[in-house]
Regions:
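Structured C-terminal helix/loop/strand segments within mature extracytoplasmic catalytic/sensor domains
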Residues: 102-206
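Single conserved hydrophobic/aromatic residue that forms the stacking wall/gate
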Residues: 1-12
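Active-site-proximal helix/loop microenvironment
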Residues: 18, 43-111, 115
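Non-transmembrane alpha-helical segments in soluble domains
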Residues: 30, 34, 62, 96-99, ...
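Conserved active-site and cofactor/substrate-binding residues in soluble primary-metabolism enzymes
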Residues: 24, 28, 56, 60, ...
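Short, charged, amphipathic alpha-helices and their helix-cap/turn boundaries
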Residues: 5-6, 21-42, 64-69
Length: 206
């Protein structure tokens, strides 16, 4: 259950308003994902039921956090919301649009809707850059040049600020839970295009 336990920080994030209202919270989460992706993701019911039946580690940690007053809503409800969110099905196209929305300072390039405050974009991108590939994050940034977030479902979403979002999907994972083929695909494209978030333009002073 090592991979699943990594998401307990996200359980904490499930404490969105309104407190105590699971349906209201879930609607807020789905609406936000829909605005980011430009279309609604779908809950994979079979995966949700399977995860719910086996997430004992996360459940224990959630109640431990509650004991230390670090979860301010019902821990079982918070964990259920997190598990549901982890069981959402999303296409590579939707994931690319999500990345493009972040790269475009919160403005969805397809719907032209401002999804979140543009001031949050660099904060979101920096979080993706620093933890997106778990223990392989440094290696990924060094070799690919693009901040990216990976998921244990086999998806990888890259964010090139001011330029684009890019994604790839392939289920086989490496030892850190990152898609092997999706990494190679995005890395190849970025290197082929010569795009790197760390590239700088030289300023010539005359």
């Amino acid at each position: 259950d090592r991979l699943r336990s990594r998401g307990l920080g996200d359980v904490y994030k499930r404490q969105v308003q309104p407190l105590g209202n699971s349906d209201g919270k879930w609607k807020a989460i789905v609406d936000n994902m829909t605005e980011l992706c430009g279309s609604a993701p779908q809950l994979i019911d079979e995966l949700y039921k399977s995860e719910s039946a086996t997430n004992f580690n996360n459940r224990s940690i959630a109640w431990l956090l509650k004991n230390y007053n670090r979860i301010y809503d019902d821990p079982d409800m918070s964990l259920d919301l997190y598990t549901r969110q982890c069981s959402m099905g999303i296409t590579a196209e939707q994931l690319s649009i999500c990345g493009a929305t972040i790269a475009n300072e919160g403005l969805n390039p397809n719907t032209n809707k401002q999804v979140f405050d543009k001031a949050l974009a660099p904060k979101i991108t920096s979080m993706i850059a620093t933890v997106g590939f778990y223990q392989h994050t440094g290696d990924w940034l060094y070799t690919s040049g693009i901040p990216a977030k990976t998921g244990v479902g086999g998806g990888v979403m890259g964010v090139m600020p001011g330029v684009m979002g890019i994604s790839a999907f392939a289920p086989p994972l490496d030892d850190a839970g990152n898609s092997v083929k999706a990494q190679l695909a995005i890395k190849y494209i970025m290197n082929k295009l010569g795009m790197n978030v760390f590239n700088g333009h030289r300023i010539h002073v005359q």
